[in-house]
A protein has these predicted regions:
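Glycine-rich, acidic/polar active-site loops that bind/position phosphate-bearing ligands
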Residues: 1-219, 224-356
Length: 356
């Protein structure tokens, strides 16, 4: 009888060797230096697209340079895990062995009828309009935002959600967005590495299913002048392997002190590394949307609301050095013990603050 002449071994799963010279890398590699490696990322689920097994992987050069976006993310997640776990073990909970950043992203998009899309060379070539006349009616009345989802779009959304569930992407919401023919979906939060992989996968699925419904999908941040563009807002936090959200206040002063510890360090990190945060989203397309045209501006700031601002003001009044017994008591009674357990709606959201 016949035998298979090809099989997929464990070694092939763990490591492969693609060409590392043709990949855009900003000059890290010379074009004649071709050897590179992909390595399996077992922390993100493999999945099947059609009949193809897709394996989340990192991509490095023969000499160790990072050639992808996943490797820096994994390094950052590991650094946060080590630092946060040390703090938890030393001061708050010795049972914590891992701290994972969690991420819930939003995906905004425009749908354009395929025939109309193909009649616009600027849309086809750049993903955005380069010239045109403002419409007689835009988003002034909010009638699209608060209106019903069109039937054709709803059919697209339903098929998209079914495909997402097949691939383990936990989408939960669908709705119209502000601009005409702009829409949004969002998932449940996940571990940050998995969430990023799922968002990349989702955009590929969205474009493929849009084609089936005779739509073309636009992900450009500012495809049309005069109406809102598409943002990708991120809801971010830190979670322990014991089930705690470290950026959520607790029921007692000790838990609130734990929250304040991570809260002030997050603000310090935003202050110290604002340039890196800004650089991470400083694409040409995003700069069309930010600052001059839409909130938020290019200046990195953090809006925390009047309640938490008051808490930090009280903390600043404590004298330098060791706390006196009176200060310890006053701090516990006046600040740490009084943060409400749930901060839901304690403060508005400030659209002029990129980190809010």
């Amino acid at each position: 009888g016949g035998r298979a002449i090809e099989r997929f071994s464990g070694g092939m799963l763990i490591q492969q060797e693609p060409d590392a010279s043709s990949f855009p890398n900003g000059g890290i590699r010379n074009t004649f230096e071709a050897r590179g490696y992909t390595a399996w990322d077992p922390t993100s689920p493999a999945f099947i697209m059609g009949t193809t097994l897709c394996i989340p992987s990192i991509f490095i050069s023969y000499t160790g340079e990072t050639l992808d976006y996943k490797t820096p993310l994994l390094r950052a997640l590991n650094a946060v895990d080590e630092a946060a776990t040390d703090v938890m073990k030393s001061y708050f909970d010795k049972n914590v062995t891992k701290v994972s950043p969690t991420l819930g992203w939003e995906q905004e998009y425009f749908l354009v009828d395929t025939a109309l899309y193909q009649s616009r060379p600027d849309l086809v070539l750049t993903g955005k309009t380069l010239l045109g006349h403002s419409p007689a009616k835009g988003q002034q009345l909010d009638d699209h935002y608060f209106g019903s989802i069109p039937t054709r779009v709803m059919n697209y959304m339903k098929e998209l959600e079914i495909e997402c569930m097949k691939l383990g992407i936990p989408v939960t919401t669908r709705h119209n967005e502000v601009a005409p023919n702009q829409f949004e979906l969002a998932p449940m939060f996940e571990e940050a590495n998995v969430a990023v992989d799922h968002n990349s996968l989702l955009m590929d699925i969205m474009a493929r299913i849009a084609h089936k419904h005779h739509f073309h999908i636009l992900f450009h941040e500012k495809p049309f002048a005069g109406v809102n563009g598409s943002g990708k807002h991120n809801n971010w936090s830190l979670g322990t392997d014991t089930g705690e959200n470290l950026l959520s206040p607790g029921k007692n002063p000790k838990k609130n002190l734990q929250f304040l510890t991570f809260f002030v360090n997050t603000l310090k990190a935003v202050h110290d590394y604002a340039d890196l945060l800004r650089a991470s989203i400083a694409s040409a397309s995003n700069d069309h949307r930010l600052g001059a045209n839409e909130a938020p501006p290019a200046i990195i700031s953090a809006f925390i609301g009047s309640q938490l601002f008051g808490v930090l003001e009280e903390l600043e009044k404590v004298t330098d050095g060791k706390l006196s017994p009176e200060e310890k008591t006053e701090l516990k009674l006046n600040v740490v013990g009084k943060i409400p357990e749930i901060l839901l709606d304690n403060t508005d959201r400030n659209r002029t603050s990129p980190f809010a």
